[in-house]
Amino acid sequence: MSMLKKYITLSILIMMLGCNKAPKQENQITAADILGNQNYIAISYGGYRQKTRDVQPTMKELKEDMKILAAMGIKILRTYNVQLQQVPNLLKVIKELKLEDPNFEMYVMLGAWIDCKNAWTGKTPNHEIESEQNEGEINRAVTLAKQYPDIVKIIAVGNEAMVNWATNYFVRPNVILKWVNYLQDLKKKGELPKSLWITSSDDFSSWGGGDSSYHTKDLEELIKAVDYISMHTYPMHNSHYNPTFWLVPENEEGLSDEEKIESAMQRSLKFAQKQYDSVSNHMKSLGVNKPIHIGETGWATVSDGHYGVEGSRACDEYKSGRYYELIRDWTIKSNISCFYFEAFDEQWKDARNTMGSENHFGLFKINGEAKYAIWDLVDKGLFDGLTRNGKHITKTYNGDKDALKKEVLVPPTPEEFSIAHQ
């Protein structure tokens, strides 16, 4: 063999060995690789700044948000619909950022919104029939998944679309099952990547973790059809609707205010864990064993309603920050992905009431101020040089924890809660 042939042969062998040892490229990284992986922290994302979604975030605004989230280690985003331009623009922005910086890494759990017939029309919703708009929504999601296979790793069919308290739009599980099966068939045909995971993101009860009325044959088939279960749990909301775990028990009335609050937050974590376990138990009772991740959980920082001064007294930055710390610690240690709700405050959600809790779930305020939950990241300098809406990332309360704590209320006793709700 000539020296040239020997050199070429040796070069090919080295290249082959190098390829075998090289880390996966982004188009090879799959949902199975990133979900439950502590190196891929997840969050729910919406970039709306105004009181209406008629004003879409600009490409520049989306880009500054992505830089902020990447700086804090976020690598998976959950979005909710593809009806509007935000998500297509977001995917363009992520692609641009990847071209600008080979080390930039961000993946998307793409939500396709599902409605029942007459949802949001002023007419009586028909929960037995799906909206004719659903087909177009699914097709848009498919198009984007094909266009950005290196970014879109999951499609979620519906958001809280099966839970009965979503009275404006919920559908029966057979509708979700129909579209999940449709997407799974596209994977089998090679029209979508086989590694693309399909799920639906819904309340723990919709996945069989609560009332037995949800234990239907269609739900059983859905659990078998999805690649993993994406469940929601909200101790904060349940501090009003199912408050037993939240209220200060008689044997703790002698504790300090700080101890009462910490005890309530520990019980809140256990509440979320119990709901997670209930979904897992139902799934296993069907002879199914697949991953379960948390598609949504969060804790608002402001409320003038059920969770405020005259209610369960759950909402403030301290409790929200403590919940964020507790839920992150547990899920990371348990290899559970947690799409924390949410990255930034969005004021369109309760546009008529600036103090409504739905507007205040973000880790950041709209103006870019970092809430108590992530003050430590500001201290570490992770956001140095970054801005939102032209403003540098600073701490709420100017970083004064004593000022923050003046607004923190102790959870009520059962008697106090009862009097407030007479």
Language model segments and positions:
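C-terminal motif of bacterial Sec signal peptides marking the signal peptidase cleavage site
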Residues: M16-G18
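Boundary/entry segment of secreted carbohydrate-active catalytic domains
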Residues: A22-D65
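Aromatic-rich peripheral "rim/lid" segments of glycoside hydrolase catalytic domains that contact
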Residues: K24-A31, G305-L326, W330-Q422
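Short, acidic/polar
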Residues: K51-L69, N134-A145, G209-L219, G321-L326
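Catalytic domains of carbohydrate-active enzymes, especially glycoside hydrolases
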Residues: E61-Q85
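Conserved, mostly hydrophobic/aromatic
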Residues: L77, I155, I229, I294-E296, ...
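Substrate-binding cleft of extracellular glycoside hydrolase catalytic domains
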Residues: N89-L196, I294
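Noncatalytic carbohydrate-binding groove/subsite architecture in carbohydrate-active enzymes
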Residues: S131, M162-I294, A300, D304
